[in-house]
């Protein structure tokens, strides 16, 4: 507090105390034959005290002594007040509560009737009542508590956070789909193709996030998760075995990320909201899977709202989606190269399941070699080039509507889920070229309700195909998700699948699939 403020405070307090002392002293020295108390009350305490002081000259020295003693007490109290004010200023306002208490001067203030509080007492009670009322209103308006954070194990500064999605699907297919509980394509429309019914927990996802202590600005993390579809998900139906999805470690900052291990491909990175193989949903036209890789990413802001994104990876060849036994694709001893360039607008939405931005447009592609071995007499072997070029778009319109879509073209795409999972022509041993695309509309009706509608197609080049291979795969679906709680959802999906075959009847099926999802 400034010095002139202290002097003013001291002067005001001294004048008030002096006036009170004069009134008390005059009343104490008033002689018996003085005017009645009612007259003194009508005249006011100050006037009465002054008249008595002039009438009783013999008591002047006594009154001066009393005044001097009380002035000394006042100075001591003022010094104490000044010390408290200085302490308050030094403590940044934390000592405001003690200094807010009214100044109590012993033997100066007259006794009050407890039934009639003074103005000071009333002013103390009013803030207390107001604070209590505000606290009550705030308590009533407080939102419901958020779900408790996920439990974590911690040892030597390393956190291990288990997570998962327990998923139970019930599905009915009006005709044969491959493999059945999940869908890659429709089986040929021949008499032996029958309808199907499945109850499956195979989409259940289990995993752990691992977080090490930071090294400077770098976060050190890891992830391991798996579902129950097994290493060849298109060749087994409801035969549960681990299919590892992510197994990687990473170091990242706000602008850079380095990853090593198994993770999703860089090409065509958007997922639909279909229940088919949820949460890494598949529909025709979707390219990419998970494979071992070493990856570098950078996110460079080019304005307040726009970000340039570059991702590059060296990846290992895999053959997860082998369907036919005649042709086996394998690596040639060389890695695949993958790259994606994108322009993003806004920040990733942490409330979105996939942390998507309001707008992101990307182009991506890959290049590599595959070695095909045709089983027969004689054995035939040939190396072919696998490649793709891809466009992806995710765009949020307003607060409720989002548009997602991807387009690809390429060759030898079987282990990227392209070309309807076909890599080679087993007769001529040539690579199968294909184009595909999918698009989806998502509408969030409320915090609890979401609806989705999508269509996708995968179209291999007919001249690259042999008899009995698939020439077109189409799928359209509509579904809804309802969040009973943030961690318990129910959903249902209705879809139609249509697959054309070379030399065989077209396969077509309707599919109804309700599901329950529990997140932990």
Predicted segments with their positions:
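Bacterial N-terminal signal peptides that target proteins for export
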Residues: 2-13
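Bacterial N-terminal signal peptides
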Residues: 12-24
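N-terminal periplasmic/intermembrane-space "pro-region" immediately following the signal or transit peptide
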Residues: 27-179
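Outer membrane beta-barrel
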Residues: 147-184, 188-320, 331-346, 353-355, ...
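Sequence/structural signature of outer-membrane beta-barrel proteins
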Residues: 173, 213, 228-233, 263-269, ...
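Outer-membrane beta-barrel "beta-signal"
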Residues: 339, 482-484, 507-520
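Detector for outer-membrane/organellar transmembrane beta-barrel domains
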Residues: 339-470, 474
């Amino acid at each position: 507090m400034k010095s002139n403020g202290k002097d003013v405070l001291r002067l005001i307090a001294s004048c008030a105390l002096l006036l009170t002392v004069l009134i008390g002293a005059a009343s104490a020295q008033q002689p018996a034959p003085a005017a009645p108390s009612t007259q003194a009350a009508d005249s006011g305490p100050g006037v009465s005290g002054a008249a008595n002081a002039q009438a009783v000259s013999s008591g002047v020295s006594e009154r001066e002594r009393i005044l001097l003693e009380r002035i000394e007490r006042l100075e001591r109290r003022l010094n104490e007040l000044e010390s408290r004010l200085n302490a308050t200023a030094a403590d940044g306002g934390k000592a405001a509560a003690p200094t807010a208490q009214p100044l109590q001067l012993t033997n100066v203030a007259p006794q009050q009737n407890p039934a009639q509080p003074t103005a000071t007492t009333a002013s103390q009670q009013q803030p207390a009542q107001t604070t209590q009322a505000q606290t009550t209103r705030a308590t009533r308006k407080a939102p419901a508590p958020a779900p408790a954070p996920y439990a974590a194990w911690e040892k030597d500064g390393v956190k291990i956070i288990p997570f998962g999605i327990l998923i139970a699907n019930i599905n009915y297919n009006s005709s044969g789909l491959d493999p059945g509980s999940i869908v890659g394509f429709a089986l040929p429309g021949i008499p032996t193709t029958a309808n199907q019914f499945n109850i499956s927990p195979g989409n259940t996802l289990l995993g752990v996030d691992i977080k090490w202590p930071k090294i400077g600005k770098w976060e050190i993390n890891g992830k391991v998760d798996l579902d129950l579809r097994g290493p060849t998900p298109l060749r087994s139906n409801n035969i549960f075995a681990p299919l590892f999805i992510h197994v990687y470690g990473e170091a990242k900052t706000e602008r850079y990320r380095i990853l090593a291990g198994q993770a999703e491909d860089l090409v065509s990175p958007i997922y639909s909201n279909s229940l088919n193989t949820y949460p890494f949903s598949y529909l025709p036209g979707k390219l990419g899977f998970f494979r071992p890789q070493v990856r570098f990413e950078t996110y460079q802001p080019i304005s307040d709202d726009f970000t340039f994104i570059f991702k590059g990876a060296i990846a290992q060849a895999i053959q997860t989606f082998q369907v036919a036994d005649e042709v086996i694709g394998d690596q040639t001893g060389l890695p695949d190269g993958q790259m994606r360039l994108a322009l993003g607008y806004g920040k990733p939405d942490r409330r979105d399941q996939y942390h998507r931005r309001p707008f992101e447009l990307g182009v991506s592609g890959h290049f590599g070699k595959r070695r095909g071995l045709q089983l027969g007499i004689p054995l035939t072997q040939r190396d072919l080039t696998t490649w793709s070029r891809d466009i992806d778009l995710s765009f949020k319109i307003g607060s409720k509507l989002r548009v997602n879509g991807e387009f690809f073209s390429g060759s030898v795409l079987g282990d990227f889920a392209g070309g309807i999972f076909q890599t080679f022509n087993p007769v001529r041993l040539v690579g199968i070229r294909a184009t595909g695309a999918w698009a989806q509309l998502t509408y969030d009706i409320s915090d609890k309700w979401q609806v989705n509608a999508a269509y996708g197609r995968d179209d291999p080049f007919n001249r690259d195909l042999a008899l009995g291979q698939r020439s077109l795969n189409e799928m359209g679906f509509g579904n809804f998700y309802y969040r009973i709680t943030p961690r318990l959802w129910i959903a249902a999906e209705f879809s139609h699948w249509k697959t054309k075959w070379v030399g065989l009847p077209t396969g077509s099926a309707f599919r109804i699939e309700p599901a329950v999802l529990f997140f932990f």
